[in-house]
């Protein structure tokens, strides 16, 4: 079982010290802040035969079984493949587990992540377990996007917000996790991850700073008419679509903010500030607003794993982006 992260200590002191437990909890917050580690730590305490406020004892039979991955009263439900939905028959297996008697005579614990990966049928199948608790069972649901959950799911859980850690705590942790990276690089990684330290660590492993430099260089060449949309779109094959749409949404928002305030502060990372200012001065606000609306719609499709033609989607994005300067 994972240890909790330093920024979770205050939250754990609330959760771990409870004498009575609800049937279901929803831990929600941004991705990359350690909600899974917190849920696993809590699950271990709930299953432990000699629990303390700090967590599980780590020595009893239940803790030993959990460490070995063979605890009969612990059920983890997650997509069978990364980025795939949780299927209804997986949830039916969970329901079957919930109605069974605990084999060790204590409570049963279910960990489900991410809850938004359930489609409507899977979520409806889960509702029965949420509506009709069976024995001493605790369900721990984790969500990175709670707005995508059915209201009936959320209403049957005790909802616990897991906030983004402060920048100082995140940078301190990143400095230990990535000791070879200079402070400036860590700050850039944290900014690129939206302030989520675990996401920053993951993106570092994917070469996000190099990907960002490639994309920024391409955007500048596009605006200077040194490259066309089609070859540029193809050259970005290694850059994840969610990252691309996050960046373009941020840049478009920066353009709008600059048009309204002419404030050069708050325009994001230095690599795109001059481009944002240029587009803010040269683009019609209605055109920028239309671009932002389109980006947000497409970003949602990307996040929902819609079946999209990647190159055509990026070509459409780049054609619109290149047309921003000018009347309209």
Swiss-Prot record:
Disulfide cross-links: none
GO biological process, one term: DNA-templated DNA replication
GO MF terms held by the record: 3'-5' exonuclease activity; DNA binding; DNA-directed DNA polymerase activity
EC code: 2.7.7.7
Entries under Pfam families matching the protein: DNA_pol3_delta2, DNApol3-delta_C
InterPro entries tied to this protein: DNA_pol_HolB (IPR004622), DNA_pol_III_delta_C (IPR015199), DNA_Rep/Repair_Clamp_Loader (IPR050238), P-loop_NTPase (IPR027417)
Domain of life: Bacteria
Top-rank EC class of the record's enzyme: transferase
Family matches, as SUPFAM superfamilies: P-loop containing nucleoside triphosphate hydrolases
Annotated catalysed reactions: DNA(n) + a 2'-deoxyribonucleoside 5'-triphosphate = DNA(n+1) + diphosphate
Alphabetical UniProt keywords: DNA replication, DNA-directed DNA polymerase, Nucleotidyltransferase, Transferase
GO cellular component annotations of the record: DNA polymerase III complex
Keyword Methyltransferase: no
tRNA-binding keyword on record: no
Subunit and partners: DNA polymerase III contains a core (composed of alpha, epsilon and theta chains) that associates with a tau subunit. This core dimerizes to form the POLIII' complex. PolIII' associates with the gamma complex (composed of gamma, delta, delta', psi and chi chains) and with the beta chain to form the complete DNA polymerase III complex.
Role this protein plays: DNA polymerase III is a complex, multichain enzyme responsible for most of the replicative synthesis in bacteria. This DNA polymerase also exhibits 3' to 5' exonuclease activity.
Name of the protein in question: DNA polymerase III subunit delta'
């Amino acid at each position: 079982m994972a240890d909790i992260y330093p920024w979770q200590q205050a939250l754990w002191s609330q959760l771990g010290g409870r004498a009575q437990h609800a049937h279901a909890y929803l831990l929600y917050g941004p991705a990359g802040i350690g909600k899974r580690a917190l849920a696993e730590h809590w699950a271990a305490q709930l299953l432990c035969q000699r629990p303390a406020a700090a967590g599980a004892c780590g020595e009893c039979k239940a803790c030993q079984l959990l460490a070995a991955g063979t605890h009969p009263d612990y059920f983890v439900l997650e997509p069978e493949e990364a980025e795939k939905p949780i299927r209804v028959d997986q949830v039916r297996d969970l329901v079957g587990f919930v109605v069974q008697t605990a084999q060790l005579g204590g409570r049963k614990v279910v960990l489900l992540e991410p809850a938004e990966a359930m489609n409507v049928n899977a979520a409806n199948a889960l509702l029965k377990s949420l509506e009709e608790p069976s024995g001493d069972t605790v369900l721990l649901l984790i969500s990175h996007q709670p707005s995508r959950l059915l209201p009936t799911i959320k209403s049957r859980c005790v909802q616990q917000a897991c906030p983004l850690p402060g920048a100082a705590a995140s940078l301190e942790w990143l400095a230990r996790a990535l000791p070879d990276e200079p402070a400036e690089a860590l700050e850039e990684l944290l900014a690129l991850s939206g302030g989520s330290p675990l996401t920053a660590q993951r993106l570092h492993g994917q070469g996000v700073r190099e990907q960002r430099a490639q994309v920024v260089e391409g955007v500048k060449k596009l605006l200077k008419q040194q490259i066309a949309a089609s070859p540029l779109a193809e050259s970005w094959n290694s850059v994840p679509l969610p990252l691309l749409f996050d960046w373009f949404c941020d840049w478009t928002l920066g353009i709008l903010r600059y048009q309204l305030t002419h404030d050069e502060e708050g325009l994001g990372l230095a690599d795109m500030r001059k481009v944002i200012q240029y587009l803010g001065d040269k683009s019609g606000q209605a055109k920028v607003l239309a671009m932002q609306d389109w980006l947000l719609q497409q970003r949602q499709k990307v996040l929902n794993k819609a079946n999209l033609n990647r190159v055509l989607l990026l070509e459409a994005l780049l054609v619109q982006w290149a047309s921003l300067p000018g009347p309209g």
